[in-house]
Design a protein with these regions (language model features):
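Basic helix-turn-helix/winged-helix DNA-binding cores
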Residues: 5-129
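Intrinsically disordered, low-complexity, charge-dense segments enriched in Lys/Arg
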Residues: 123-210
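Short, Lys/Arg-enriched N-terminal segments with co-localized hydrophobic residues
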Residues: 1-3
Length: 210
């Protein structure tokens, strides 16, 4: 599978989903690299018309969005498989026609980041600690996009993960989210992110000598 997203890419994706969610589509579009904006991939040509009440994203659009924003290689086949496997319990069914909501897209991006360290079963159980029933948003301990933004904020940090509790609690106090599971899941996501980052660095270093 493709490279893990670096902290900057995670932040860009988080911002894009957030702007789309609050209806600031121009700000979302401004995040794409200039060459992409000049020639949007066909899946994203209508992105400027995106309306949160009316539009969802297909799996191909979820993939195209991440790849165009971050130069990643997320695969539609992988996600298609997830929607048939155990992990579909956490993604939920397509909500808007045959398409997924932006919150569901955030869950898919999280799954992609976590799959490097945890099995799909572990990942499902882990995300179920904060996202209860994927087909309803109101029972989540935190909205998926807001959690993805929190994760983006901390993915940049290099402090020891077990020392992040106090800081993360302060970040959360500024929001309406208070459930202790949020911090536990955040830390597990950060472990996954760091393990993969270290693995990548190690391999790049090795390749200089062999």
């Amino acid at each position: 599978g493709g490279r893990m997203r670096d902290a900057t890419s995670i932040q860009t994706l988080a911002d894009c989903l957030h702007f789309m969610q609050v209806g600031e589509i121009e700000r979302a579009i401004a995040l794409f690299p200039e060459d992409v904006r000049e020639h949007f991939p066909k899946e994203l040509r209508k992105i400027h018309l995106f309306h949160i009440e009316k539009n969802g994203l297909s799996i191909n659009q979820i993939v195209a969005l991440a790849n165009a924003l971050t130069g990643e290689h997320l695969s539609a086949t992988t996600i298609q498989n997830w929607t048939k496997r155990e992990v579909r319990k956490i993604i939920g069914v397509p909500r808007i026609g045959k398409k997924y909501s932006l919150h569901q897209a955030a869950i898919i991006y999280l799954l992609d980041d976590l799959k490097h360290l945890f099995s799909l079963e572990e990942t499902s159980s882990l995300l179920a600690l904060i996202f209860n029933n994927p087909d309803r948003d109101e029972d989540d301990f935190i909205k998926p996009i807001d959690f993805y933004r929190l994760y983006a904020e901390y993915a940049k940090s290099t402090s020891p993960i077990d020392l992040l509790d106090t800081r993360a609690k302060r970040s959360l106090e500024k929001t309406k989210y208070t459930h202790p599971n949020i911090i536990h899941v955040l830390k597990l996501c950060l472990y996954a992110h760091r393990v993969t980052t270290l693995e990548l660095e190690a391999k790049q270093y090795l390749n200089r000598f062999i």
